[in-house]
Amino acid sequence: MIPMEELKVKKITNGTVIDHIDAGKALMVFKVLNVPKETSVMIAINVPSKKKGKKDILKIEGIELKKEDVDKISLISPDVTINIIRNGKVVEKLKPQIPDEIEGTLKCTNPNCITNKEKVRGKFKIESKNPLKIRCYYCEKFLNEVIFE
């Protein structure tokens, strides 16, 4: 049997590294960020982690996340660490927190909600962070799944 070689992923010079993503959720995180298609992205899925057993990692060259993006990530995988990289150095480490309220970003799962019938931006209250329970401000229904706009 041929021994497996360790695959090393190149460091990024400027951009964002999202580490400690729950295993199997990197593609979901990538999708909600709407990264331009010409952007260099590295995704590692189910890599060994001392803290979690397995984790995913996402490296995005040339893009620093906005607060709205960080909020989205916190709803998918709340224990991530986000590192902002400039000139090859970590200049900022972010530990996202699930916000108490969310405006926009999410879509109500109730087909009868006003947000699904008219041009009204969704507004939501986080009732519980663990387990995650989100209530629509307008129809007061709990979301049965997280759907991003």
Swiss-Prot record:
Belongs to the PyrI family. One of its GO terms (biological process) is 'de novo' pyrimidine nucleobase biosynthetic process. PANTHER family: ASPARTATE CARBAMOYLTRANSFERASE REGULATORY CHAIN. Signal peptide: none annotated. InterPro entries: Asp_carbamoyltransf_reg_N (IPR020545), Asp_carbamoylTrfase_reg (IPR002801), Asp_carbamoyltrfase_reg_C (IPR020542), Asp_carbatrfase_reg_C_sf (IPR036792), Asp_carbatrfase_reg_N_sf (IPR036793). Heterododecamer (2C3:3R2) of six catalytic PyrB chains organized as two trimers (C3), and six regulatory PyrI chains organized as three dimers (R2). It comes from Methanocaldococcus jannaschii (strain ATCC 43067 / DSM 2661 / JAL-1 / JCM 10045 / NBRC 100440). This is Aspartate carbamoyltransferase regulatory chain. The gene is pyrI. Pfam families: PyrI (PF01948), PyrI_C (PF02748). Disulfide bonds: none annotated. Involved in allosteric regulation of aspartate carbamoyltransferase. Zn(2+) binds at C108, C113, C136, C139. Keywords: Metal-binding, Pyrimidine biosynthesis, Zinc. Its cofactor is Zn(2+). Binds 1 zinc ion per subunit. GO terms for molecular function: metal ion binding.
